[in-house]
Regions:
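Functionally critical transmembrane alpha-helices in membrane proteins and complexes, commonly lining
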Residues: 6-73, 93-97, 214
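Short helix-coil transition/hinge motifs at the ends and kinks of transmembrane helices
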Residues: 30-46, 74-79, 114-136, 232-239
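Generic alpha-helical transmembrane segments of integral inner-membrane proteins
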Residues: 17, 98, 102-106, 110, ...
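Juxtamembrane transmembrane-helix termini
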Residues: 55-91, 96-119, 223-229
Length: 245
């Protein structure tokens, strides 16, 4: 398992690099559509540096495999605990999110002091990134708190110029919705718990934006991979005695 996780860590590292490269290219280079007669090397450069969205999908699949798989394992072993699960997940998310919000505030305010119009969308067409005239940077307390509790793209915009914060909101709601749905269908769950789970799931599905829910389908692919690996292991254990001498 450790050998497999090393490969997953390498894959996550590569995906993170692809995301950074795409954001950097969007800031430094014109879009591919604006190029005139690009050569093969230029096309290759834009292809390799344009895989940021696909890399985020890889993150979602890996998250579904690791986090969703841990939920399945805990339920199967009878060791499931909402308290322990939420504590682990919230800690992992906030360790990244809180520093990101504070750094965004610091760098945005520093940048705003030197070029305020850039944070109002004046350079959007030039850099193909950042705030737009219709949606300028928002550093309000309400937006900060909304992002802290993963409500960006739902009730508040992403904080400041940190647009990639949308992905953390997606992750949080997938972490919450998946075990609720799973517990509904687990055998032995009390009827009262099933009803509460159904109500919570219905509220979340109604409340969450459609693009976020569609991303959840990608997240579930990772869960599916975990489940298939489990089935494969069970089949190997069942068939192994037939091949013993």
């Amino acid at each position: 398992m450790k050998h497999r996780l090393v490969h997953l860590d390498c894959l996550r590292g590569l995906a993170a690099l692809l995301v950074v490269v795409e954001h950097l290219r969007a800031f430094l280079f014109v879009p591919f559509a604006q190029l005139k007669a690009p050569g093969i090397l230029t096309k290759g450069f834009y292809l390799v540096t344009g895989l940021g969205h696909q890399a985020v999908m890889i993150f979602f699949v890996l998250s579904g495999f690791l986090v969703g798989g841990s939920v399945i394992t805990a339920l199967q072993a009878g060791k499931w605990s909402w308290r322990g699960y939420l504590l682990r997940r919230m800690t992992r998310l906030w360790v990244v999110l809180i520093p990101a919000l504070l750094l965004t505030l610091f760098w945005d305010k520093l940048g705003y002091a030197h070029a305020p119009t850039g944070y109002e969308g004046a350079y959007r067409e030039l850099y193909h990134s950042g705030p737009t005239p219709s949606i300028p940077s928002d550093w309000s307390i309400g937006t900060f708190l909304g992002n802290t509790f993963f409500l960006q793209t739902i009730l508040v915009p992403c904080f400041g110029t940190n647009g990639p914060l949308w992905s953390l909101a997606n992750e949080f709601w997938y972490y919450l919705l998946f075990p609720v749905l799973l517990i509904i269908f687990v055998s032995g769950t009390r009827i009262q718990v099933r009803i509460i789970g159904l109500l919570l799931a219905a509220c979340m599905i109604f409340f969450l934006p459609r693009p976020m829910l569609m991303g959840g389908v990608i997240w579930l692919l990772g869960v599916g991979v975990f489940y298939l690996i489990q089935i494969e292991k069970e089949l190997e254990q069942e068939t192994a005695p037939f091949f013993l001498p």
